[in-house]
Amino acid sequence: MAHPPRLNDDKPVIWTVSVTRLFELFRDISLEFDHLANITPIQLGFEKAVTYIRKKLANERCDAIIAAGSNGAYLKSRLSVPVILIKPSGYDVLQALAKAGKLTSSIGVVTYQETIPALVAFQKTFNLRLDQRSYITEEDARGQINELKANGTEAVVGAGLITDLAEEAGMTGIFIYSAATVRQAFSDALDMTRMSLRHNTHDATRNALRTRYVLGDMLGQSPQMEQVRQTILLYARSSAAVLIEGETGTGKELAAQAIHREYFARHDARQGKKSHPFVAVNCGAIAESLLEAELFGYEEGAFTGSRRGGRAGLFEIAHGGTLFLDEIGEMPLPLQTRLLRVLEEKEVTRVGGHQPVPVDVRVISATHCNLEEDMQQGRFRRDLFYRLSILRLQLPPLRERVADILPLAESFLKVSLAALSAPFSAALRQGLQASETVLLHYDWPGNIRELRNMMERLALFLSVEPTPDLTPQFMQLLLPELARESAKTPAPRLLTPQQALEKFNGDKTAAANYLGISRTTFWRRLKS
């Protein structure tokens, strides 16, 4: 479908689609973003929304749609416009449960497609009777609500459809989405539209692709982290390609952005300040056919559905700056060959094109894979490895930075409590210190990301039920992962995709998360 052309000074066009109380939240939050985008609310759902939007798209442009739950999934499977799905965060779920817990101890939680296994710990800690259900269709949701009503449930936590059905049935409905989560969806939609429209104006895109992290964000005072920071400063003296190696959650993109910032800070000090984009792509999260067009761009008519006038690829967008290739070990072999040629020739030819475009780009790549093993197995080109790894940076796992674990836990807990307007007391600091053995004993397979997420969860518990006695036993009750016996080697590396799939009873999303890879990569490995 041909959409109306975009003018260079146009703001992104975003439509919000909802049929329940989410409509009002959309309306309120959209006021905070109306200076950044043209936002139109659509109060329809499912097939009525699809029919209306398709008709509207015949004469109007839309860059992104924001929706939620089963309605959002329905739209995403039937529309060509990108649909940003709002997903409740851990904060949203626990805050809704805390609100429901003040009303009754008999609570139902009804979520789209899947239940939430992590709520088992919450149920035990606060002595609540949680009845978790999932649904696919509206009829399915109505059936789940009726069963909860028959079982004596008094309050139901869920999306707008669920809370409306619960209140129709005479129960209390607790809305699961927070304003913060909706704001994040608007931010994601803006980021996505900026990326998809970058071919129209490189300068505007460069301004939108600034780095978020600096060297000071590499937290930790251990000798290992001091060595990492010193290495980053050293690599900032060179424009050579860098390969960052480390487990999932060790901060590979953070390190890449720090190298970018430090290098161009030195560069601009000598030659004058300029715009230097930092462009990132996850090579394992995009299908091979799409990744080729994303990296190298395409000409008009290169394939069905290609944009009029073609589109610049990430190499062109990153000209004068840095291209960060995350999970480079997941890149398919045919694209590895083409990437090698671009790196050697310093020019790129768009898909369907014939004219090479010179590019001046520093490439920083990252992987959690064992590339040496992949090269031996023929999954990764050795010549490309040598081209990408002129400089190498190894990020240590958290279990090897034991001196950093307690200070990081305290820092993350402070930030998380502050976000909830809750104080960090001396008693909490003492409780963390008393729980140091528990924290140090855990293997931290998710590294920094896992520690931060745990402290966010702990903060939410503490904001609901403040306790002056944060004991190791209480920590293990709230964070059951800490009670498990740590293995010397991270568990994900011990399982094949098939074994992980069996471990999680066929749940592909859970298996991919456990292995620390995307669903696309999981499928690719499962088939190989």
Swiss-Prot record:
One of its GO terms (biological process) is response to radiation. Residues 508-527 bind DNA. The keyword Mitochondrion does not apply. ATP binds at A318, H319, G320, G321, T322, L323, F324, L325, D326, E327. SMART domains: AAA. InterPro entries: AAA+_ATPase, Homeodomain-like_sf, HTH_Fis, P-loop_NTPase, Sig_transdc_resp-reg_PrpR, Sig_transdc_resp-reg_PrpR_N, Sigma_54_int, Sigma_54_int_dom_ATP-bd_2. Keywords: ATP-binding, DNA-binding, Nucleotide-binding, Transcription, Transcription regulation, Two-component regulatory system. The keyword Transferase does not apply. Residues 218-461 form the Sigma-54 factor interaction domain. This is Propionate catabolism operon regulatory protein. It comes from Escherichia coli (strain K12). The gene is prpR.
